[in-house]
């Protein structure tokens, strides 16, 4: 089942005023922003040599410590590369150069640490912030996947961008969960009509807010 979050695209956490943003963006850890009990930054965006340089990668191939690339179609021309972003982002960017591409989808799948699901309840809100550079405007579909018991709930938000900051907020309270424990979370960054475009993800963070406690 898929739920679309009604929250505004700017999100509820202002990372620009997060005192711990510098250390967190540089090393993947640091003080948490206000009202958050867990935060994560993908290793691709702070670890040296974390991103594999790949020409014509196969679908399902690992491209970093926590990321895989998925797509359909057999005649796509895709390159994966590391990029040095401008100031204000992480020290490393994950780049995709997409040329001829006839498939229906292209997606970056990020494995989220198990700690994200520990102590989580249905009264939880997640915010995903992504910094991007694109040659041409593009639509991202940010999807949070939550496994509980033997079921997976998905929360999807579409964001259009010409580059810069995009944000999606996923409120688990809008889904009716059956009895069971939360066990796993992963994040998909799906790209609509990616052909003839150069897309660089300069940063990706995921924040957890237990709103039921307030």
What are these regions (language model features)?
Residues 1-73, 213-214:
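Activation corresponds to long, low-complexity, non-globular regions
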Residues 83-106:
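Short carbohydrate-recognition loop motifs
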Residues 131-140, 177, 193-196:
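Extended, low-complexity, turn-rich repeat/linker tracts enriched in Gly/Pro/Ser/Thr and Asp/Glu
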Residues 149-182:
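Extracellular carbohydrate recognition and processing domains
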